[in-house]
Amino acid sequence: MFRTRVADEQIWSAIEHICFYLLLPALIVRTLSRANLTSVPVLDFMLVLVSAIAGMSFLLILMHRLLRSRYPDSGPTFSSLFQGATRFHGFVALAIIGPLYGDHGITLTALALAIMVPVLNIANVIVLTIYGSNNSVANGRQILFRIITNPLIIACVVGLTLNWTGMPDIIFNTIDIVGNGGLGLTLLAVGAGLRLDQIAEDKLLVTVGVLIRLIGMPLMVIAIASLIGLEGLPRTVAIIAGAVPTAASAY
């Protein structure tokens, strides 16, 4: 649809913003507010995701030495590789898991967002501060601001709060109507945002980043989940969260 210009780029940008700031948060709030969280192994789920991020971050830092031989000014290059290999696209994760596993899958995906987004924001800003250019440096206040203003994180907090306090049916039904349009429009927005003809100049670096993100990260999750003993749908959701493409912010 984007290629045929049925709608121009500004409309697709508006759709993406509506999904990110309204539809997907509504979907998360609706799901978490009525979810049975007692059946979710939260600690094991969190341990798998955080350990996978930490393990991949450590391996990437070791790879920085290999980059020095090819890239004299390897700091900014490494920070770009690190972002592309560790960040994940929450839109795509929700769009895949929702239709496959229903509300329970969305609940686990929302928890994955609540766990991974703060950890990844902190890790990536630290790497940018150490390895990136001076223009990339961000202080602790900026990191905190990015986390607490993320609509998906806010939705997780609101949904978990309503799960504890309860929510009137009329409000739930309204949020349900809004959230139901989220997944379909999200898939359209993700597809319209693909720019296969604008691959970065350094194809080797792009290839390495893609392989780490799409193959290395899910393998890391599988290995850690096996060690910890995470099974069933939580394991599946963790693997999918590790296997989806990098977030748009990584670009």
Regions found by a protein language model. Give the residues of each.
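Alpha-helical transmembrane segments of multi-pass small-molecule/ion transporters
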Residues: M1-Y251
